[in-house]
Amino acid sequence: IKVSKLAEQFKLRIFNPYPLDLRIGSLWVNFQKKYEFNPIHDHDGVFSFIIFMKIPFIMEDELKASPGKNAKHNLAGHLQFFFLGENQQSHIEKIAIPADKTWEKRGLIFRSHLNHMVYPFYSSDDYRVTISGNFAFDNSNMRYDGPNN
């Protein structure tokens, strides 16, 4: 009898889960200067976001000013994401976002555990300013009935 009651509660949790509110878990502002970079990292929570408030360069000028201007992959000023390829075994895929002045007042939302980094910029003495944060589920209203209920 107890097993069937537990199975019934499990069925209710799967098909009628408690609602979870999505909340901002953390919020911060980044001020990045010329030559600075943000190394590869990920975040806490479920989703993260970046809002590009001020980007002090145009990508065309940035790529020309970069010390890697003759490199095969010049990523000056880019935001880059890293993830496993389709076979999920060893191939790492990369997506580079050329976030320049045209991205101002725009944003990105991505899974928090997605590794990413920000490359340095070289063509401006102004700050790159972004607002970033993490969304997390608020489960404070969840209750557990337990196997004895």
Model region roles, listed by residue range:
Residues G25-I109, Y119, D126-V129, N141, ...:
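Catalytic core of non-heme Fe(II) oxygenases with the double-stranded beta-helix
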Residues N16, D125-D126:
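Short helix-terminating capping/connector loops at secondary-structure junctions
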Residues I1-N38, L75:
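Non-heme Fe(II)/2-oxoglutarate
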Residues L114-M117:
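Short, charged beta-turn/beta-strand-edge "cap" motif at the junction between a beta-strand
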Residues G133-N149:
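Double-stranded beta-helix
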